[in-house]
C-alpha cells in the first residue's frame, strides 16, 4: 500500500509540474502572438524573456540556490519546479529529533519529492483549518532556532499555507516576501552589559508545562531537540543568542518525539495551569531600633512644619519686595533713582542667597565655634555673658580687602575718651552660642523654634532687639542679634539702687510699649523682668529673650515634639527603661513610657489619633492653643495664675511690669523671700503679703499715684489693670482644663487667639501716673541715661553682668523631674523647679540699700559675683535618661534642633 501511494503521489506531482511547465513555456508565445507582429515583436519578446530570466536568477541567488543556465526556458522551469517542491513536498520542522538536511536545490527531481513523502516519519499535510496556527508557530520557532544555533546550514523547508491552484503574480510576491522575511531576514542581536535571564523565561516554562500536560503519552529520547547541520554563511551567528528557544527550556537528557509538540499555540492566559507561585526570598525581619524611631520622628516634624510654612503664604522675599515697592511709592524718586534702588535690592538678595548656599553646602567645623562664625562672616571678639545654655559673644563683621580700601565699611573711631555712639556706624553684634545638647536635655526644641520665629516676625519692630542672622553647626546654634551697648536695665538698677519716680515713669512707659509690641505680634513674653530689657546706644529700651514666649502654635509646643517620638516607640514596641528612678516608678505604679498629661492641656484621643488626610488643617484647627498653662518664668516676677497652673493670657506680663515698677521705686521686689517656695507662697497670697514700706526716707517720696498703679497691676487677672478685651477670657478660665483648646469666637474684630490682644494697655496708659507721657513721640525724646563708651568694642556695661536670677521653665509634672537651669542672653542663670520644692537663691529685702545715698550694699556686690551651687541635672525626657539609648538619641536629636533653627 505504501508503494502504491508513493507512485500515485509521484504521478500527481509530475502531472502538476508538467502543467505548470507548459504554462510557463506557452506564456512567451501567447504574449508574442497577442502583442506585436513580425521580427520587431519577436525581438521585444526576447528582451522581455532575458530580463525576466535575470530577475529570477538574482532572486534565486539571494535564496542561496545555484541556477542552471542551459536553454531558454530552463530558468522559468526551474523556478516553478522549486515553488511546487516547496508547496507540496515539505515536511514540518520537528523539535524532537534530528533530521537529514537537504543540500542545495541543484539536481533536485520528482523522485526526491516522492522519497520524502514515503519517509516513515512523514506527517500528512495539516488541514486548512490549522494552517494559520501552523504557519505562526513555524515562523516563531524558526526564528528562535536561528538565534540559538551558532553555525547552521540551510533550514528545513517550512510548511506554508499555499493553495494547490495555479499561482498568480500577487501570490508569488507575497510568497517570496514572506520567505525572505522569515527565513533569511536580517538578524537583530541585543547586547547587554550584564547578560541575564529574561523575565519571559517563566512564561515559556509555563507553556512547556502546558504542552506536557496535554500530551501525557509522549515518548522521550536522548537525542538532541535541535537540528544540527554544517555551517552556512547565511545562518552563522557572531554572538550568543539573546532570546529563549523552546528547546532550551526542556530538561537536559529528555526530549519529546511528538512532532506537533513544538507547534501548539496557547490562545489565552486561561489555558495556563493555576499553580501557586513560589515565595519570594526576602531578607529576614529586622526589629525596629531607636535610630529608626528618631529618624522617622525628625522627618515627620520637618515635613509638617516645612509644608505648613509653604502653605501659610509667608514668603519673606515677597514681603521684602512689597516693602521695597511701598518705599518707592512713598518717596518722590526719579526713574533713574528707582532703577538704582531696585538694582541695589537685587544685589542684596543675590548676596544673601549666595551666603545661604555657602552655609548649607560647606562642611561645618565640629570642634571650633570660631570656624563656624568665621564661615558665616563674623569674627569673635570677647564674651559678654555666660549662661547654663551657652554664652553670648561680641562679634564683628568680617571686612574684605576691597571694602576696606574703598571705604564702604567705615571703621569705628578709637578714642581715649568716652562718648555717645549715636550716629556712629555699628560694625559689631551680639551672638548667642547655644549648646544643642543642653537644649535637648531640657526639652527646649519648641521654645527655640518659637523664639526664632518671633524674632523673624519682629524684624522691623522699634521695640524688639532685631535678629541679624542665624546658623548652626554640629554642636551649637548661633543667633546673631543687634548689639545693645548700654547693657540691660538690671545693671542700671544695680548701679543706681533706687530710681527717682520721674525716671522710673519714663522707663516703665517704654517697657509698656515693648510689651505691647510683643502682644501686637500675638506673643506672650512670660519672662518680663529687668534682665530682658536692653539699653541701646541712644538710651532707649528694647525687649529681648523670647525663649519662653507663647503664641499658641502647635509647632511651638514641646509636647508636639515629645509625642512624635513616644508615639512611634509605643507603636513599634520599643521598651524604654529610663534611669533607676524611672524603673522603680514603673515597677511600683506600672507607669507607661508616655505620660497621661501634656504640657499645655490633657492628652486627648484627638492627639493620639490624628487624621491621615488634611493633617495640617486639622492641627491648625484642633491643636492651636488658645490659653497658656505652663508654669514658666522667674519666680519673683511670676503672676499668681501662672504659679497655680491655671490657664492664663497676656495679662501675666502686666503683673510682671508692676513688680518692676515696685523694684525701681523701693529697690527690691515686693515678694522677695529666702527661697523660691516662700516667694511663690507670698505671690499666691498676695492680698495679705503685699505691702509698701514707709520707714525709709526714700519710701516717703513715692507718690500715691505710683502706689495706686502698682496696686492695680498686682491684682488677680480679673481685676488687673490692662484692657477690657480680656473680660471674655474670664468665663473661659473658669472651665475645666480642656479650656486651653476652647474654640473662640473669631467674629470678634479684636480676636487674636484669646490668649493675647493687641493694644491691650489702654487702661494702663490712661492711668494718672502716666499723665504727661507722649506715647506717640516717646521714642524721640531724650532718655535719662545715655551710655558713654570709647567705642563699639567697649563692654563696660556688661562686665558686671553675672546677675542672679531664678528663672523657671515648663515645670509640668509630665516632663519635669529635676532641677534645670535656663539661659538668658545677658549672663543670668535661673533654675527650673517644682512649686513645692524649696530652693535657695531669692534675695532678702534686707539685702537692698536702706537709704538714698547711692552707696552699694555689700550684699548686692557679693550677689553679683556669687556662683550658685548647681544641683544634679536630670534629663526631662525619659528616653534621654536611659543609659542604653541616651547617647544615640542625643546625637540624632541634634538634627531636629538644626531643622528648627535653620
Swiss-Prot record:
Q: Its catalytic activity?
A: L-seryl-[protein] + ATP = O-phospho-L-seryl-[protein] + ADP + H(+); L-threonyl-[protein] + ATP = O-phospho-L-threonyl-[protein] + ADP + H(+)
Residues the record lists as binding ATP: 384-392, 432
Catalytic EC class = transferase
* Active site (catalytic residues): 527 (proton acceptor)
This chain's protein is named Serine/threonine-protein kinase cbk1
The answer to keyword Nucleotide-binding applying to this record is yes
Q: Which Gene3D superfamilies match?
A: Phosphorylase Kinase, domain 1, Transferase(Phosphotransferase) domain 1
In what ranges is there compositional bias, type Low complexity? 222-239
Alphabetized, the UniProt keywords read: ATP-binding, Kinase, Nucleotide-binding, Serine/threonine-protein kinase, Transferase
Region Disordered: which residues? 1-22, 97-154, 207-288, 797-875
Q: Name one GO molecular function term.
A: ATP binding
Biased composition, class Acidic residues, residue ranges = 807-818
User: Where would I find the Protein kinase domain in this sequence?
Assistant: 378-732
Give the gene name.
cbk1
Which residue ranges have biased composition labelled Polar residues? Answer: 125-134, 240-259
Q: Function, please?
A: Protein kinase that seems to play a role in the regulation of cell morphogenesis and proliferation.
| BP term (GO), one | intracellular signal transduction
Q: Which Pfam family, any one, appears in the UniProt record? A: Pkinase
Q: Which InterPro entries match?
A: AGC-kinase_C (IPR000961), Kinase-like_dom_sf (IPR011009), Prot_kinase_dom (IPR000719), Ser/Thr_kinase_AS (IPR008271), Ser_Thr_kinase_AGC (IPR050236)
Comp. bias (Basic and acidic residues): 97-118, 142-154, 210-221, 264-274, 797-806, 833-843
**AGC-kinase C-terminal domain boundaries:** 771-831
Q: Which residues form a coiled coil?
A: none
The residue range of the signal peptide is none
UniProt keyword Kinase, yes or no: yes
Family of the protein in this entry: Belongs to the protein kinase superfamily. STE Ser/Thr protein kinase family. COT1 subfamily.
The enzyme's E.C. designation: 2.7.11.1
Amino acid at each position: 500500500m505504501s508503494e502504491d501511494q508513493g507512485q500515485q503521489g509521484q504521478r500527481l506531482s509530475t502531472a502538476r509540474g508538467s502543467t505548470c511547465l507548459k504554462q510557463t513555456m506557452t506564456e512567451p508565445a501567447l504574449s508574442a502572438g497577442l502583442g506585436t507582429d513580425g521580427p520587431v515583436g519577436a525581438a521585444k519578446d526576447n528582451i522581455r524573456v532575458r530580463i525576466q530570466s535575470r530577475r529570477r536568477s538574482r532572486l534565486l541567488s539571494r535564496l542561496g540556490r545555484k541556477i542552471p543556465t542551459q536553454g531558454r526556458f530552463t530558468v522559468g522551469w526551474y523556478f516553478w519546479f522549486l515553488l511546487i517542491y516547496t508547496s507540496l513536498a515539505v515536511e514540518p520542522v520537528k523539535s524532537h529529533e534530528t533530521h537529514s538536511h537537504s543540500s542545495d536545490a541543484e539536481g533536485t527531481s520528482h523522485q526526491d519529492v516522492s522519497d520524502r513523502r514515503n519517509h516513515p516519519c512523514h506527517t500528512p499535510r495539516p488541514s486548512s483549518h490549522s494552517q494559520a496556527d501552523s504557519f505562526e508557530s513555524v515562523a516563531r520557532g524558526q526564528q528562535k532556532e536561528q538565534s540559538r544555533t551558532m553555525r547552521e546550514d540551510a533550514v528545513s523547508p517550512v510548511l506554508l499555507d499555499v493553495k494547490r491552484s495555479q499561482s498568480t503574480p500577487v501570490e508569488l510576491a507575497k510568497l517570496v516576501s514572506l520567505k525572505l522575511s522569515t527565513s533569511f531576514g536580517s538578524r537583530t542581536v541585543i547586547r547587554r552589559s550584564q547578560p541575564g535571564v529574561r523575565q519571559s523565561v517563566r512564561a515559556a516554562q509555563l507553556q512547556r508545562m502546558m504542552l506536557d500536560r496535554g500530551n501525557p503519552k509522549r515518548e522521550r529520547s536522548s537525542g538532541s531537540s535541535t537540528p544540527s547541520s554544517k555551517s552556512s554563511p547565511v545562518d552563522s551567528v557572531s554572538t550568543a543568542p539573546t532570546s529563549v528557544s523552546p528547546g532550551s527550556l526542556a530538561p537536559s537528557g529528555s526530549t519529546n518525539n511528538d512532532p506537533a509538540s513544538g507547534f501548539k499555540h496557547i490562545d489565552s492566559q486561561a489555558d495556563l495551569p493555576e499553580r501557586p507561585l513560589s515565595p519570594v526570598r526576602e531578607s529576614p525581619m529586622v526589629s525596629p531600633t531607636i535610630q529608626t524611631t528618631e529618624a522617622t520622628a525628625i522627618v515627620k516634624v520637618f515635613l509638617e512644619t516645612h509644608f505648613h510654612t509653604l502653605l501659610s503664604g509667608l514668603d519673606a522675599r515677597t514681603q521684602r519686595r512689597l516693602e521695597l515697592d511701598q518705599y518707592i511709592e512713598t518717596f518722590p524718586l526719579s526713574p533713574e533713582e528707582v532703577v538704582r534702588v531696585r538694582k541695589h535690592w537685587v544685589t542684596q538678595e543675590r548676596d544673601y542667597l549666595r551666603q545661604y548656599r555657602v552655609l548649607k553646602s560647606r562642611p561645618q567645623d565640629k570642634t571650633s565655634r570660631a570656624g563656624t562664625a568665621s564661615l558665616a562672616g563674623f569674627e569673635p571678639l570677647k564674651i559678654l555673658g555666660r549662661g547654663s545654655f551657652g554664652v553670648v559673644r561680641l562679634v564683628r563683621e568680617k571686612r574684605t580687602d576691597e571694602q576696606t580700601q574703598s571705604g564702604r565699611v567705615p571703621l569705628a573711631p578709637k578714642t581715649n575718651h568716652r562718648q555717645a555712639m549715636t550716629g556712629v556706624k555699628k560694625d559689631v553684634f551680639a551672638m548667642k552660642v547655644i549648646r544643642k545638647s543642653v537644649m535637648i536635655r531640657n526639652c527646649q526644641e519648641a521654645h527655640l523654634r518659637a523664639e526664632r520665629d518671633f524674632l523673624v516676625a519682629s524684624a522691623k519692630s522699634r521695640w524688639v532687639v532685631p535678629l541679624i542672622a542665624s546658623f548652626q553647626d554640629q554642636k551649637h546654634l548661633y543667633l546673631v542679634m543687634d548689639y545693645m551697648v548700654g547693657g540691660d536695665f538690671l545693671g542700671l538698677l544695680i548701679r543706681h539702687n533706687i530710681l527717682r519716680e520721674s525716671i522710673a515713669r519714663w522707663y516703665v512707659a517704654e517697657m509698656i510699649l515693648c510689651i505691647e509690641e510683643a502682644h501686637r505680634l500675638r506673643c506672650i513674653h512670660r519672662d518680663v523682668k529687668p534682665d530682658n530689657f536692653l539699653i541701646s546706644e541712644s538710651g532707649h529700651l528694647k525687649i529681648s529673650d523670647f525663649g519662653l514666649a507663647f503664641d499658641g502654635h502647635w509647632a511651638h509646643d514641646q509636647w508636639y515634639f515629645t509625642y512624635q517620638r513616644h508615639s512611634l516607640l509605643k507603636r513599634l514596641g520599643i521598651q524604654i527603661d529610663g534611669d533607676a528612678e524611672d524603673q522603680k516608678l514603673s515597677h511600683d505604679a506600672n507607669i507607661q513610657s508616655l505620660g497621661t498629661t501634656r504640657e499645655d492641656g490633657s492628652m486627648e484621643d484627638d492627639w493620639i489619633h490624628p487624621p491621615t488626610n488634611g493633617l495640617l488643617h486639622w492641627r491648625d484647627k484642633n491643636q492651636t492653643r488658645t490659653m497658656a498653662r505652663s508654669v514658666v518664668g522667674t519666680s519673683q516676677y511670676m503672676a499668681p495664675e501662672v504659679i497655680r497652673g491655671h490657664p492664663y493670657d497676656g495679662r501675666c506680663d502686666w503683673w510682671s511690669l508692676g513688680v518692676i515698677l515696685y523694684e525701681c521705686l523701693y529697690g527690691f521686689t515686693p515678694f522677695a523671700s529666702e527661697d523660691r517656695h516662700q516667694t511663690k507662697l507670698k505671690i499666691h497670697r498676695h492680698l495679705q503679703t503685699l505691702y509698701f514700706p514707709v520707714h525709709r526716707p526714700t519710701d516717703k517720696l513715692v507718690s500715691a499715684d505710683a502706689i495706686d498703679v502698682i496696686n492695680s497691676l498686682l491684682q488677680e487677672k480679673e481685676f488687673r489693670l490692662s484692657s477690657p478685651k480680656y473680660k471674655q477670657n474670664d468665663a473661659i478660665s473658669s472651665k475645666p482644663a480642656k479650656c486651653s483648646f476652647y474654640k473662640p469666637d473669631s467674629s470678634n474684630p479684636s480676636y487674636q487667639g484669646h490668649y493675647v490682644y493687641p493694644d491691650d494697655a489702654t487702661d494702663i496708659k490712661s492711668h494718672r501716673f502716666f499723665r504727661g507721657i507722649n506715647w506717640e513721640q516717646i521714642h524721640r525724646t531724650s532718655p535719662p541715661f545715655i551710655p558713654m563708651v570709647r567705642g563699639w568694642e567697649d563692654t563696660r556695661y556688661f562686665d558686671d553682668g553675672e546677675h542672679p536670677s531664678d528663672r523657671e521653665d515648663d515645670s509640668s509634672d509630665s516632663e519635669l523631674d529635676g532641677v534645670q537651669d535656663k539661659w538668658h542672653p545677658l549672663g543670668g542663670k535661673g533654675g527650673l523647679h517644682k512649686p513645692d520644692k524649696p530652693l535657695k537663691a531669692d534675695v532678702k529685702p534686707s539685702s537692698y540699700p536702706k537709704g538714698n545715698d547711692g552707696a552699694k550694699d555689700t550684699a548686692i556686690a557679693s550677689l553679683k559675683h556669687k556662683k550658685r551651687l548647681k544641683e544634679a541635672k536630670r534629663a526631662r525626657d525619659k528616653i534621654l535618661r536611659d543609659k542604653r539609648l541616651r547617647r544615640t538619641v542625643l546625637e540624632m536629636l541634634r538634627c531636629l534642633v538644626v531643622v528648627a533653627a535653620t
